[in-house]
Amino acid sequence: MITSFDDWPVHQSHLPIAHTATGDPNHYDRYFFNGYDSEGDIFFALAMGLYPNRHVMDASFSVIIGDEQVNVHASARANHDRMRCTEVGPVSVEIVEPLRRHRIRVDSPEHGLRADITMNATSVPFEEPVFQQRSGLRETMHYTRLTQLGRWTGWIEIDGVRKEINPASVTGSRDRSWGVR
């Protein structure tokens, strides 16, 4: 069963938070968000992953406005305090209200990209069936994922030109997954 704490990157296995840890180096805890407007003028996506057994975090934010695309990628050593693993370089995810509202900020002047956008859920989170895959006797994948729809508000700025994000026309989805992959 998914609980509000499952929205944080604190999982120790492919199961919801209350279960035991794994030493598998492919254990991960990841966010993915996307947004687009109904006119096709903007598309953006964020991916952020924590790989605790490798002591690595990474993040990527991409935006397309008109015919211009800007991408920001960052990687860092993972903080041992899992509650401090929602910021990598210039990209951060803030859980404003678990399973309801998430804020993304990007501040990368060297790429000419800044953003402050918030996704407000328009659906309950859907827990997908646990996925498991083996290669012979070896487990290669075993993870849980939740997916959710929402509307976006805020702004994205490229080279000083700000684009307001209107929740009436900018929708998207997100997923959270954790386990071994």
What are the residue ranges of the model-derived segments?
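Targeting-peptide/extracellular-domain and disordered-appendage signature
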Residues: 1-181
